């Protein structure tokens, strides 16, 4: 209902009813009973899966996530009162098209307010992930968090550690990718959740940068500006790359002829790995994010690269994400896109066969003409590929002649 009233496309539809789960499964024989204790049934309709839940009230939450007791109800008001925020507690009567608002959710939608239902501390202590959900909804919708709700989040922020890393990971990913990422991280900071979850990001605050390259200010501001420029529906890897690419700056900060962060990309890889591992991101996500962090400074040298180095650079896996990270890096600092335009132009100019040409020689070819297997063979093949990428050689005969001239005793 929330998204429909805001004029946004609704991603899914949930149904609440006084019917018990066994009645629902009788009506829909193919339905899947996924939460008998909670009266939740999944019903397939065409290509959609709809969650059908029985009205219920709940007892205390001893574990901070699951209610100790569930009572099935016939009164929708009791069901609504257990929900997290007023804007998520609006119901639509399908027979009359009447919006049923029992907690002031429609007024909060109109005012742009995220407000916990009832006593905020109790709502958050029922499920501590709601601390982050409040931030996500405020960021994505461009809403403010109601003062009493905000105060409760700040007071309970240390309890976010009671939530599993996997659930925190999913919420961070959604904050980064569903819109309003910059606002989301400002709110994580303001509520104290950033301090609890990502102290490495918090350390960016106040770390100044050379003004000739970063007139925007410190590393924190730079990162927020990049998050603000993220395209719609970015991949999690790109969004995480933006968030983490400069985590190596605080520990490498020094003042010499100017402010410098020598080796910050390498330091950032180590820090990013610690964060992503702590939050239990999958290995393929970790690998790509670390690749983005490790290579983000290479763009500054792209116009000076020789042909072989540039072509190898351009053929990095998922290079589009590297290129987009660089564009955002520029937009979040001095705004100069000349290097991005150069690299993008080269990418469009060079056909795939020039970036990844067919190999002229293999190790077997070299063994066949008398070379012995060993570490030097890799050096030989790299030299051949360099010359091929540079356009110096074009045939197997030329490649073998090059090897003989350089490596034959």
Model-derived features: where do they sit?
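Catalytic cores of the polymerase beta-like nucleotidyltransferase superfamily
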Residues: 1-409
């Amino acid at each position: 209902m929330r998204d429909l009233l805001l004029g946004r496309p609704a991603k899914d539809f949930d149904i609440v009813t006084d019917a018990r789960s066994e009645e629902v499964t009788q009506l829909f024989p193919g339905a899947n009973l996924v939460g008998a204790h909670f009266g939740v049934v999944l019903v397939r309709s065409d290509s959609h899966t709809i969650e059908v839940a029985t009205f219920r009230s709940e007892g205390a939450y001893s574990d901070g996530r699951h209610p100790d007791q569930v009572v099935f109800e016939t009164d929708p008001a009791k069901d609504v009162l257990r929900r997290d925020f007023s804007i998520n507690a609006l119901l639509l009567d399908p027979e009359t098209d009447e919006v049923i608002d029992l907690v002031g959710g429609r007024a909060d939608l109109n005012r742009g307010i995220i407000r916990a239902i009832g006593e905020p501390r109790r709502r958050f202590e029922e499920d501590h992930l709601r601390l982050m959900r409040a931030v996500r909804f405020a960021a994505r919708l461009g809403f403010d968090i109601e003062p009493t709700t905000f105060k409760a989040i700040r007071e309970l922020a240390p309890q976010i550690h009671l939530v599993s890393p996997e659930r925190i990971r999913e919420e961070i990913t959604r904050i980064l990718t569903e819109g309003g990422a910059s606002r989301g991280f400002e709110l994580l900071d303001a509520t104290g959740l950033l301090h609890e979850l990502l102290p490495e990001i918090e350390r960016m605050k106040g770390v100044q940068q050379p003004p000739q390259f970063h007139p925007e200010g410190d590393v924190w501001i730079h990162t927020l500006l990049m998050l603000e420029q993220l395209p719609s529906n970015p991949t999690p890897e790109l969004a995480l790359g933006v968030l983490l690419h400069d985590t190596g700056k605080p520990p490498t900060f020094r003042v010499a002829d100017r402010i410098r962060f020598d080796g910050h990309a390498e330091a950032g890889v180590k820090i990013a790995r610690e964060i992503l591992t702590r939050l239990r991101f999958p290995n393929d996500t970790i690998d790509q994010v670390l690749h983005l962090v490790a290579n983000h400074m290479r763009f500054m040298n792209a116009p000076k690269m020789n042909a072989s180095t540039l072509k190898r650079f351009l053929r990095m896996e998922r290079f589009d994400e590297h290129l987009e990270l660089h564009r955002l890096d520029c937009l979040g600092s001095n705004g100069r896109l000349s290097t991005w335009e150069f690299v993008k132009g080269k990418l469009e100019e060079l056909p795939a066969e020039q970036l990844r040409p067919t190999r002229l020689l293999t190790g077997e070819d070299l063994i066949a003409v008398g070379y012995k297997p060993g570490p030097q063979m890799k050096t030989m093949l790299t030299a051949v590929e360099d010359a091929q990428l540079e356009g110096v050689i074009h045939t197997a005969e030329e490649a073998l002649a090059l090897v003989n001239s350089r490596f034959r005793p």
